[in-house]
């Protein structure tokens, strides 16, 4: 980066260039060697300017402010500003760097600024990133760091991470105030420091630094007392109109840092082109008392009026501050009668319940209260006189009085409460608890309160009540309802309800820690279970739910089957009464037999599936149960029970479904008992069922076919068929009458038709 120096510094640079061969090393050494000399000259000039400013300020403070004197002060300040601008522009390493893109318009702006400052050496390079070596401090985030690196490299800059080769340091305000290692190195070498807070807009826009200002430090003035300007003190310009080419037109702005104490602040250098958009800002009371030194070169009359008003406010504040001390002392001894009477009444209300217990004597308290009232009357008289004298005080004084009054009131409360209050802790605690309760109730009544918080508040209230009166806990406990039913009773009722279902046997499974039951079965389909103790387990609940679902499904299936059987029975009876022609041919007989076979097959398959399911559940129950019971426990379907049910079912169906003649009607049940239960059909069925366990279905089909063909019902069918074939066909009387009537009507209709 090409830097401009004063004439003395240029001679030193020329001498160093003649002595050394490498131009790059020469430039680096020259910059490092010239910094101390330039810094000394700059310090001397600035000290001289500061002395002149102090003398002018003392003279101006002694004189009353007027518009003429203000204009004179402004002119002097402008002259000082111009001098400081010249010094800052001559010493580039001390912090005068400017950012704007390399355009012709920016070069014209720079030339105009040089003419304004009357210094040919003030013209600087158009691009601060040209051949720039920068260092990024550790306080900057990694993501922000990479963004800055990309922007600077994109615009021709070179990143360098050693302070000996860098020309700029980029850090944060925090890092600058904490004086990190990089910052201290940059201060020692005189490298300008850029603060990230004034560069961050560039990272977002992904472009060269535009109108947004960045901070450049002149760190060699007073390194020990360096302080950054606040963001309000810095001059920030709004975004100017961008040209169509995408470049930003900007004007050079030189920024500095506060490097001295508050009393001796440096003057910010401001160009006339940017003065129209600037406004003076107040920072501290000291700067408000002193005349403002940072003003524009051309001031408007409105701004002059503002300055006068500020001076008046400063004078009023000084007058008010003089009255502050006296008013505080006077207000410290004054308390109104109303506040004192309210305090005494509140104290008496808290003491009255304790007076009944003979714990507190109010005689001394009354004497003290009377004395306090007399003193307060005297103080109020003085208070009125003082108020007449202090009517012109500001609002800030009134606030301070109120604060002092409140403090004195608190002291008097303590003095009254300390009289014979040895046992008043319980009353104060109760009053505080009542206040807390009222607050909780008020909060609970708001419409936005949720159930969770209301429950918590109620719980807190109950806890507080329980601490005060432990008997509340016994009354607040929930009581059992008189009409309640115990768990054992409910389970026994539920078990009795389930046990009354037809066709199943229920049992109570025992576990060591969950069940002790005595199950008594009372013959037939009605079962009852008496439970002594019962405790649910998760596995038992799941199994019971599955059993109930299976039972409901079985009941529905049985009801459907019974309905179908009733329908078949009704149809058979109607057929016997009305028509006896169902068995006229062998085809009808075969169809009838096939239908019966299919029905029996479906029923047997369902029974087999139920049996297999019961066996699996029985096996599972045997594995899970760990109780040594004398009687073997099984699932609801045992083998004997299923066989007996199937036998009954087949006998009933054979009696209902197969129509028999009245002469040869003989029940299969009697035949079954006469034969001694040695019927071939049932024997084959039960043998196949018991041996195969429901696996071999072909044998069952063959046995069913043989049973139907060999049964007496088949012989009765054959005999009825032979009888029906011999009888002549005669329709019923009703049909004959119907046929005759229709014939007569038709003949009459045709006779009525006209003949052709």
Curated annotation (Swiss-Prot):
Start-end of Low complexity biased regions: 16-66, 75-94, 285-298, 364-401, 422-432
Biased composition (Acidic residues): 536-587
GO BP terms, alphabetized: regulation of mitotic nuclear division
Chief site of localization: nucleus
Compositional bias of kind Polar residues: 1-10, 95-113, 514-529, 668-691
Gene Ontology MF terms in the entry: calmodulin binding
Sequence segments annotated as region (Disordered): 1-113, 229-251, 272-298, 359-403, 422-463, 514-587, 613-639, 660-700
Cell location: Nucleus
Knocked-out gene: effects: Mutants lacking the DEED domain form multinucleated cells.
Residue intervals of the BRCT domain: 124-216
One Pfam family in the UniProt entry: BRCT
Region of interest (DEED region), residue spans: 537-588
Disulfide bonds: none
Motif mapping: Nuclear localization signal: 464-480
SMART domains hit by this protein: BRCT
Top-level taxon of origin: Eukaryota
Start and end residues of each stretch annotated as Calmodulin binding: 495-512, 589-606, 596-613
Biased composition regions of type Basic residues, renumbered to the chain: 448-459
GO CC annotation, single: nucleoplasm
Keywords assigned: Calcium, Calmodulin-binding, Nucleus, Repeat
Subunit structure: Interacts with calmodulin and CBPD1 in the presence of Ca(2+).
Protein name (record): Nucleomorphin
Native organism: Dictyostelium discoideum
Gene: numA
């Amino acid at each position: 980066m090409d830097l401009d120096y004063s004439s003395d510094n240029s001679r030193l640079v020329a001498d160093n260039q003649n002595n050394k061969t490498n131009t790059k090393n020469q430039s680096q050494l020259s910059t490092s060697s010239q910094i101390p000399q330039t810094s000394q000259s700059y310090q001397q000039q600035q000290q001289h300017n500061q002395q002149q400013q102090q003398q002018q300020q003392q003279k101006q403070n002694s004189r009353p402010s007027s518009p003429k004197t203000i204009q004179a002060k402004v002119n002097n300040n402008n002259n000082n500003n111009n001098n400081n601008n010249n010094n800052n522009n001559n010493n580039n390493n001390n912090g005068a760097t400017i950012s704007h893109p390399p355009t012709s318009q920016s070069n014209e702006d720079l030339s105009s600024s040089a003419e304004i400052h009357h210094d040919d050496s003030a013209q600087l390079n158009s691009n601060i990133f040209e051949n720039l070596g920068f260092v990024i401090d550790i306080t900057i985030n990694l993501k922000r760091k990479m963004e800055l690196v990309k922007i600077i490299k994109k615009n021709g800059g070179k990143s360098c991470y050693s302070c000996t080769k860098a020309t700029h340091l980029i850090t944060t305000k925090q890092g600058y105030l904490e004086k990190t290692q990089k910052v201290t190195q940059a201060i020692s070498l005189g490298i300008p420091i850029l603060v990230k807070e004034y560069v961050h807009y560039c990272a977002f826009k992904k472009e060269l630094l535009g109108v947004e200002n960045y901070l450049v430090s002149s760190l060699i003035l007073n390194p020990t007392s360096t302080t950054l300007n606040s963001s309000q003190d810095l001059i920030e310009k709004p975004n100017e109109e961008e040209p169509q080419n995408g470049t930003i037109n900007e004007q050079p702005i030189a920024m500095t840092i506060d490097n001295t104490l508050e009393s001796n602040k440096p003057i910010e250098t401001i160009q006339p082109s940017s003065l129209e958009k600037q406004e003076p800002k107040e920072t501290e009371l000291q700067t408000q008392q002193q005349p403002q030194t940072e003003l524009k070169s051309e001031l408007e009359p409105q701004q002059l009026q503002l300055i006068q008003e500020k001076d008046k406010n400063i004078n009023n504040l000084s007058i008010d501050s003089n009255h502050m001390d006296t008013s505080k002392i006077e207000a410290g001894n004054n308390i109104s009668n109303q506040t004192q009477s309210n305090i005494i009444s509140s104290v008496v209300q808290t003491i009255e319940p304790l007076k009944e217990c003979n714990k507190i004597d109010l005689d001394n308290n009354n004497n003290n209260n009377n004395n306090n009232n007399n003193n307060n009357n005297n103080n109020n008289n003085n208070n009125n006189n003082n108020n007449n004298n202090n009517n012109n005080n500001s609002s800030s004084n009134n606030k301070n009085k109120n604060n002092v009054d409140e403090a004195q009131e608190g002291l008097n409360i303590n003095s009254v409460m300390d009289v014979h209050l040895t046992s008043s802790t319980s009353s104060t605690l109760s009053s505080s608890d009542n206040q807390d309760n009222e607050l909780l109730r008020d909060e609970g009544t708001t419409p936005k309160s949720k159930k969770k918080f209301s429950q918590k508040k109620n719980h807190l209230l109950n806890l507080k009540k329980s601490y005060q009166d432990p008997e509340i806990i016994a009354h607040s406990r929930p009581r059992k309802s008189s009409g309640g039913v115990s768990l054992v009773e409910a389970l026994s009722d539920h078990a009795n309800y389930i046990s009354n279902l037809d066709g199943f046997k229920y049992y109570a499974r025992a576990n060591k820690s969950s069940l002790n039951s005595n199950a008594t079965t009372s013959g037939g389909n009605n079962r009852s279970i008496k439970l002594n103790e019962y405790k649910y387990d998760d596995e038992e609940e799941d199994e019971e739910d599955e059993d109930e679902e299976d039972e409901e499904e079985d009941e529905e299936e049985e009801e459907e089957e019974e309905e179908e059987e009733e329908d078949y029975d009704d149809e058979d009876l109607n057929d016997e009464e009305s028509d006896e022609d169902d068995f006229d041919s062998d085809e009808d007989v075969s169809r009838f037999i096939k239908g019966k076979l299919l029905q029996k097959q479906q029923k047997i398959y369902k029974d087999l599936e139920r049996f297999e399911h019961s066996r699996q559940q029985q096996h599972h129950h045997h594995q899970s149960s760990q109780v040594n019971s004398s009687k073997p426990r099984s699932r609801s379907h045992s083998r004997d029970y299923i066989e007996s049910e199937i036998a009954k079912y087949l006998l009933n169906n054979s009696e209902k479904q197969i129509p028999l003649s009245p002469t040869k009607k003989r029940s299969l049940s009697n035949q079954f008992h006469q034969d001694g239960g040695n019927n071939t059909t049932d024997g084959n069925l039960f043998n196949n069922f018991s041996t195969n366990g429901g696996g071999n279905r072909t044998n069952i089909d063959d046995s069913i076919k043989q049973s139907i063909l060999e049964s007496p019902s088949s012989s009765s069918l054959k005999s009825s068929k032979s009888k029906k074939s011999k009888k002549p066909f005669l329709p019923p009387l009703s049909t004959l009458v119907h046929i005759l009537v229709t014939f007569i009507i038709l003949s009459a209709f045709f006779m009525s038709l006209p003949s052709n």
